[in-house]
């Protein structure tokens, strides 16, 4: 029983780490897009948001 608990808690912590890594990357990309305020910047922002939404659904 304790082995099972430790494995499940490991899986959860791994998910949290990869999730925070993904959100950090998209935050950096978002900042870059905001700096270059242009139509292409906005389209990249929208694409990034869509990709991030797909990534989040993939984690669960």
UniProtKB/Swiss-Prot annotation:
This is Uncharacterized protein DDB_G0276165. It comes from Dictyostelium discoideum (Social amoeba).
């Amino acid at each position: 029983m304790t082995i099972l608990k430790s494995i499940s808690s490991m899986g959860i912590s791994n998910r949290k780490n990869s999730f925070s890594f993904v959100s950090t990357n998209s935050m950096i990309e978002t900042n870059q897009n905001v700096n270059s305020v242009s139509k292409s910047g906005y389209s990249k922002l929208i694409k990034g948001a869509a990709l991030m939404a797909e990534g989040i659904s993939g984690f669960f």
